[in-house]
Amino acid sequence: HPGDLHHKIVATFGKHWKLSLASHRQLGEKVYDFKIGDFEVPTAKYSLTYRDLKLGGLKFDRVILGNFSATIGQGVIFENTDFFSPRRSGYSWSRRVHGVFPDISRTREYALKGLAFQAGNKLFDVMGFLSKNKRDAILNISDSSVASLITLYPRTNNGFGVESLLMPMLETLEEVTYGGSIRLIPLYGTFIGFSAYESLYDKPLR
């Protein structure tokens, strides 16, 4: 097997369209997701983004189809990532942002895939998202209910050696997550907001 692989492609079309693709695998994972004939198609993340859409009195900063990341309340209320990151209050790249963005990062267990948007004007801003994606989880042997979500590295059902695990953990759970946030802006730099999200699963959690 080759070592860790991570490939990214980002393309823009005019002022509005942006296409993002990424393929990532850890050491020990299979290279491809499925085959078309003899062609191996790798597991990939993708997003198609339309930017700067003006509709009525709203400016839609981003409308995203595919994989996206979402952050609400500096990550205190909601943030999807496989990696711990402390709250930051720095400038430029070190500042945690608010909203939804195309996602071609290495995050896979908590990756979101679906539809998301972010819009606003001088008085308020709003964001919303809907995601449906598979999750890795530890299942109870007795009834196949979910004991816990798990971040697998590498993501495989194989145990030590060539034997498979007693219960599969890779993509054993389907999750639907939806949510959003609206923030009023009475003064520049001052926000009064309401945020909510909900996650639903196709297996009981015990």
Where are these regions (language model features)?
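Surface-exposed extracellular loop regions of Gram-negative outer-membrane beta-barrel proteins
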Residues: 71-89
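N-terminal glycine-rich FAD/FM-binding segment characteristic of electron-transfer flavoproteins
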Residues: 65
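Signature for the C-terminal beta-barrel architecture of outer-membrane proteins
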Residues: 1-4, 12-46, 51-61, 90-206
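Active-site metal-binding loops of divalent metal-dependent hydrolases
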Residues: 68
